[in-house]
Swiss-Prot record:
Protein name: Lysozyme C-1
Keyword Disulfide bond: yes
One MF annotation (Gene Ontology) recorded for this entry: lysozyme activity
UniProt-annotated location(s): Secreted
Function noted in UniProt: Lysozymes have primarily a bacteriolytic function; those in tissues and body fluids are associated with the monocyte-macrophage system and enhance the activity of immunoagents.
């Protein structure tokens, strides 16, 4: 019985943690999903962005008390403008997606929403990109990844 409880807790912690991608694994996945060069944004810039937004974690969340919104998933997509979490006041849902879908281990829906955002607002929509990636050499993010 004790072993079952421990096993259950371990499974729960894995479900809450989600998938944390390895850098090169994420690079390959983003490339397969068409982000390399999308709207002129290099794969290295996408990796830099996701490193600083979520540390490559699909289940990352960040609550923003000022706007009463939450950022979700590997790209930290905001519930005020881009996804529906059912609790953010006056949400727009620009990507027409549930915020929980942006935290799935399969990041296809998150990538589709990121493409929509970068198409409308450019990569500067992400504060972490402006703070940590813009005007920096980001080539190290794809270095050694055999793409």
């Amino acid at each position: 019985m004790k072993a079952l409880i421990i096993l259950g807790l371990l499974c729960l912690s894995v479900a809450v943690q989600g998938k944390v991608f390895e850098r090169c694994e994420l690079a390959r996945t983003l490339k397969e999903l068409g982000l390399d060069g999308y709207k002129g944004v290099s794969l290295a810039n996408w990796l830099c962005l996701t490193k600083w937004e979520s540390s490559y974690n699909t289940k990352a969340t960040n609550y923003n008390p000022g706007s009463e919104s939450t950022d979700y998933g590997i790209f930290q997509i905001n519930s005020k403008w881009w996804c529906n979490d059912g609790k953010t006041p006056n949400a727009v849902d620009g990507c027409h997606v549930s915020c929980s879908e942006l935290m799935e281990n399969n990041i296809a829906k998150a990538v589709a929403c990121a493409k929509h955002i970068v198409s409308e607002q450019g990569i500067t929509a992400w504060v972490a990109w402006k703070s940590h990636c813009r005007d920096h050499d980001v080539s190290s993010y794809v270095e050694g990844c055999s793409l």
